[in-house]
Every structure is written in C-alpha cells, then in structure tokens.
C-alpha cells in the first residue's frame, strides 16, 4: 500500500469506512518480523486486542493464512473500519470484528465468543498501551 495518511487515523477516501493508520505504515513490517518466527508453524486462533484501523490484522492474516485471526476493539468507529478492511481483503481467515472491553469483567464477550476464545494460540496487541485509559 503506497498511501501514507496525514492524520494518525484518517479515512482512505471520502465515504470509505476504512481508516488508514500512520502507525501501520511505520511498524507492520518490524512487528511481523518478530511475530512470524513465533507463528510460523503454530495453528490456531489469534485474538488481536485493540485492532484499531484493522490494517495490521489484515496484513498478518495474509502472511499467516494457517491461523484464524480474531480482530477486536472497544471503539465502534474502529469496528466499522476493521469490517471494511475485512470486506475489502476478502480473506477467509479473519473473523468478524468483536467489540471487546478489557475493563469489563467478561470483556463484554458473548458466551459463544468466550467459549471459542478460551482456546487461543496467542493474544496480540500493538499500538494500544500508550492510548489506554487508566483508572
């Protein structure tokens, strides 16, 4: 992708729900360089906490089609962006985005999602800690 956003998270184009994150362009390659060694021969489910624009999970799902990726975010605008990226990419190994609130006792998951996500290969999180709310 050659587009470089002006703002930290801006729409790709007017009317397009896909957000384009500056941090994705800066760090998806070095993050994948580390993750790929760990994920290369492991099957299973990977939950991304705080998927933001959705660009990282789409890129990583392309690179690791043997894994089933579960995007999540607490922000509805980000959920919309993740879903727009998912539709655009047409990957079979990316689940629908879940609204996930790590501050909630059950993370706000349905019983079905809780059961599925109790068997994870990994939980991945990047570009979140510095913007997380503190009690």
Model region roles, listed by residue range:
Residues 2-43:
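Class I SAM-dependent methyltransferase Rossmann-like catalytic core
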Residues 106-118:
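Short amphipathic alpha-helix with an adjacent loop that forms part of the alpha/beta core around
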Residues 124:
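A conserved beta-strand element that flanks and buttresses the S-adenosyl-L-methionine
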Residues 42-52:
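Conserved class I S-adenosyl-L-methionine
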Residues 128:
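Hydrophobic adenine-recognition pocket in adenosine-nucleotide-binding enzymes
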Residues 59-109:
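Class I SAM-dependent methyltransferase SAM/SAH-binding core
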Residues 131-135:
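A short, conserved alpha-helix within the catalytic core of class I
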């Amino acid at each position: 992708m050659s587009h470089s956003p002006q703002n930290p998270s801006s729409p790709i184009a007017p009317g397009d729900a896909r957000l384009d994150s500056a941090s994705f362009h800066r760090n998806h390659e070095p993050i994948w360089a580390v993750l790929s060694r760990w994920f290369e021969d492991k099957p299973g489910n990977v939950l991304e906490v705080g998927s933001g624009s959705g660009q990282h999970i789409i890129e990583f799902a392309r690179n690791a089609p043997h894994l089933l990726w579960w995007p999540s975010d607490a922000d509805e605008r980000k959920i919309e962006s993740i879903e727009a990226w998912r539709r655009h990419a047409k990957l079979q190994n990316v689940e629908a985005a879940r609204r996930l609130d790590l501050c909630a006792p059950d993370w706000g998951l349905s019983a079905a999602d809780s059961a599925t996500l109790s068997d994870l290969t990994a939980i991945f999180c990047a570009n979140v800690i510095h913007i997380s709310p503190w009690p």
